[in-house]
């Protein structure tokens, strides 16, 4: 995969069939929903301490047959340069999900037949593997029933018995024995007279979109169980997955996927503007997940600068020389977005075809749209008086288009980290139009007709690989109790934060709860702490949120807004008064 900061154009040579086979959304994804993660005790010994601490007890997907350094845990609360090593003990450990690394053992050497099916189902669910029991032709009259287990296309030896239940148990035992043999001696040659089974590898165990969905689902299940009043918020869940490649011998690459941010929600705050920076405006799941990613990245800066040699190794950020930002995403580290619902705005407006000339459609559906007073409307129809007094948020489709150009990092982080671009977007909503989604992200504004450089370096438009992903949301409709709530979490947080969308603050029994950890004021504090840790004291003189926005980022944003307006799509709203607060 190409470096996430270089766009998607350079990654064709690295992409295996897992990702390269689908550069646009498939119209009919296979339905799939992983089961909730189970307790660690069901899986025997815990992983080695060094490995477990590095991962913080959170789900990851690892491939090939050995272990390696993880993507780096976050450091506790912002400003504390210590790894959060005990989250697993606080929240209940879940089985790690490598496929299959050394040291990962199955629960029992010879499990009872009555437990084999449940153990195999549990193991497959933790990996996100598609498990299928299928009835085969019986081998003879002595054993009238024959059942085999299939793990994502890998057919294990069949189990035969006098009843279908016993045959299924024997098939599960055969599958567990096969997996154990792969764990204990993955390089051993096949000695059986049967045809050799396909090796457990990234290509035939889990697709890219399935792995991302598995992590989002397992992460949510670790934070909340089905008895929680907030369980139904999973219907709008979005996540950010970090992929890390580790080179191996003979050209092989080990890939580790880790969930680093979660968000849920389906609406925006519709009240009056506040000017303290303590109000969370946009509470859609994708936007919240991206803000949670920023919190994770501020932690990674502290980990890289204050965590010692181990922190530098674990952090996903690395120092870079030159006059630009002092840090960048490490090589072979990539970001992926997972969303449950089609982004509101242009990506949902599919009733008008593109122009016959093949250029950018200037029709109303492709215009910028804003949420104001509970309604979504084109920005050109929003009165200036409303923009200056009420909360207004551009649609998720518009923000995806902006992130494809400016990156996910935002204006504050741009001082410290080079632009961070997502490599792929996994959409788990089958009711969408793939070409419309692609146009909404990649053609607004149109850059092909612009003469000369239209964006200051290092900003460029990047192309996201688009995938139809398996849904992980509950099948039941979201109850009204969750419609006005938004949940957020990032790697390093002790648990979920629940935000009341109506107030833009943490949900509380009182009329007004405390400010969210994702609000602008929290990020300004995090920015000053990171600037001090990185050794950029001049940034501490930028006292207000508006002043702390990086100049090159602001210039690129201004150019982007100008192009959008010139092409009839509307100008990006600007609210400088909202950022005049100080900590």
Curated annotation (Swiss-Prot):
The keyword Nucleus applies. One of its GO terms (biological process) is RNA processing. Pfam families: A_deamin (PF02137), dsrm (PF00035). Residues 261-582 form the A to I editase domain. Residues 115-181 form the DRBM domain. Keywords: Cytoplasm, Differentiation, Nucleus, RNA-binding, Spermatogenesis. InterPro entries: A_deamin, ADAD2_DSRM, dsRBD_dom. One of its GO terms (molecular function) is double-stranded RNA binding. Residues 1-48 are annotated as: Disordered. It is found in: Nucleus; Cytoplasm. GO terms for cellular component: cytoplasm; nucleolus; nucleus. Its main location: nucleus. Required for male fertility and normal male germ cell differentiation. Belongs to the ADAD family. This is Adenosine deaminase domain-containing protein 2.
